[in-house]
Design a protein with these regions (language model features):
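Active-site nucleotide/adenylate-binding loops and adjacent lid/helix of ATP-dependent enzymes
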Residues: 14-19, 51-53, 57-62, 101-196
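A glycine- and small-aliphatic-rich helix-loop capping segment at beta-alpha/alpha-beta transitions
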Residues: 84-93, 169, 174, 304-305
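Short hydrophobic/aromatic-enriched beta-strand-loop microsegments
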Residues: 92-96, 121, 211
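Short, flexible turn/loop "capping" segments at secondary-structure junctions
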Residues: 155-157, 231-232, 294
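Phosphate-binding site of ATP-dependent enzymes
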Residues: 165-253, 277-282
């Protein structure tokens, strides 16, 4: 097995790309270099790694890997499932472990952890699909009385802004909850932040993480939804974001605090909402497997911080090997 100090360029790695149908399309759009990606095909045996026509295919049997670099979005990819598989296989992998991945995917669980750590989050309500189906009126009243309008409605366990809606009145709220319930049994309803600016910050490291300069997403639509992310080019980015020095340092501090709160490792992109009217900063969510092309926000924020894309990849592989080596030193029985 290769050591972290060895030359990263000599390591043998695999990138995993798959996930549920709802987020697979987003992955293929976000990672256009598809001919170099290995795809796990659910219709075949787990031994086989297959790719779409013309793409690279390989089999696990006989394939020696030093490290796995998951670039999967959505359920089974970034919720701790594939991370658990790699733990069982005792294979080093880039990024968050099982716990951080599962908490990072579940928006309701994530908010509970952030609140317990005293991190600033907007008001929210969790709705269970079962309760919604039993008594829509009671749920509607509870949500409106606590949060008012407008609100954002999200499936708790889904990525790429799939199933997210903004509701400005009761009719839209009912429609939004019904849509989110198509994707998850648990729905998160959040109070909208007035005149919100969407600020992001990249975090890199294991037990001593560092934060990049923040960047800003300026959506071409009312908010940064699935279409704005993947299907049109009206949104733009500003890196570094136009912020005061104090705001920049607070965002970087909170990004690291959020990373540590869920025991994250390797990488994460932490998303914030900055209220335009008051300047109040809210922690929105943490993404344990952010988009990772050369033009993605995560890599661009690190590039603006002085870390090139090749060196970023090298660093993440080194962190994965370091984390795995630490685990090998731990006792698992008395």
């Amino acid at each position: 097995m290769m050591k972290a100090a060895d030359t990263i360029a000599d390591s043998r790695g695999a990138r995993l790309q798959s996930g549920e149908t709802e987020t697979r399309e987003a992955h293929l759009v976000a990672h256009p270099g598809g001919d170099t990606l290995l795809t796990i095909d659910p219709s075949t045996r787990s031994e086989e790694l297959s790719a779409r026509s013309g793409q690279v295919a390989a089999t696990v049997s006989g394939l020696t890997l030093d490290v796995v670099f998951p670039v999967l979005h959505g359920p089974y990819g970034e919720d701790g499932t594939v991370q658990g598989l790699l733990e069982l296989a005792n294979v080093p992998y880039v990024g968050a472990g099982v716990l951080a991945s599962s908490v990072g995917m579940d928006k309701a669980a994530m908010k509970l952890v952030f609140a317990a750590k005293g991190l600033p989050i907007c008001d929210y309500e969790v709705v269970l699909k079962r309760d919604w189906q039993r008594d829509e009126r009671a749920i509607m009243n509870a949500v409106v009385n606590k949060l008012g309008f407008p609100v954002f409605v999200k499936p708790a366990n889904l990525g790429s802004s799939v199933g997210i809606s903004k509701a400005k009145h009761a009719t839209e709220l009912r429609t939004a909850i019904n849509l989110a319930a198509e994707f998850d049994r648990k729905i998160v309803v959040e109070a909208a932040v007035p005149q919100a600016r969407e600020i992001e910050c990249a975090v890199l490291g294991n037990d001593e993480p560092e934060a990049s300069v923040p960047g800003e997403i300026i959506p071409g639509r009312e908010f940064y939804d699935y279409e704005a992310k993947y299907l049109d080019d009206t949104s733009r980015t500003v890196i570094p974001a136009t912020l005061t020095e104090r705001q920049t340092e607070e965002i970087r501090r909170l990004a690291i605090a959020a990373f540590r709160a869920i025991d994250c490792a390797g990488m994460a992109r932490v998303d914030f909402l900055l209220a335009g009217d008051s300047g109040v900063l809210y922690l929105n969510e943490l993404n344990t497997i952010p988009g990772f092309t050369t033009i993605s926000m995560y890599s661009k924020m690190w590039e603006a911080s002085g870390l090139s894309y090749p060196k970023l990849v090298d660093k993440l592989i080194a962190l994965a090997l370091e984390r795995h080596a630490e685990k090998q030193q731990l006792r698992t029985s008395m």
